[in-house]
Amino acid sequence: ITAETQAANVTNEGGVDGRVRFLHNVTGLWLLSESIREWEADGSRIDLPALIAEAAAVTGPVPLFPANDPRLSAPGELATRIAAVIAETGQPVPATRAGLVRSIIASLAEAFADTVRTIGRLAGREIAVIHLVGGGSLNTLLCQLLADRSGLTVVAGPVEATAL
């Protein structure tokens, strides 16, 4: 661990067979799950695949926000708090749920891509492929935006895992 890795909030994690993993935690699709929970509080049901398809069809500039903002780490009214964070950046807040979902997924993709670039730089390695695992690997919009933002190939799966 160096001062540079500490500043980047990167650490080492012991693993199987004496392996050590370079690690940086990034907020995940919990931002989307909590936003949906807020929207469903009125008793309505959100069709997630349909909402993600609508988000994929959103055109024009998509506002990005820092997905790891500590103000977004607690549950409750997350869509409202995300909108406030976007507004603070001076970007227009999406007027639709699909627009906000696109912003959430694009912001996560940017955070993931930035993490991969940072870890590659700190490790002195060129990264060619991102393996996206866990439930997010089923989200084709996330996979595509991550590939677009990182410039790398994204391999999706397995679903039964929780690390990038």
Regions found by a protein language model. Name each.
Residues 1-130, 138-162:
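Active-site core segments that coordinate phosphate-bearing ligands/cofactors
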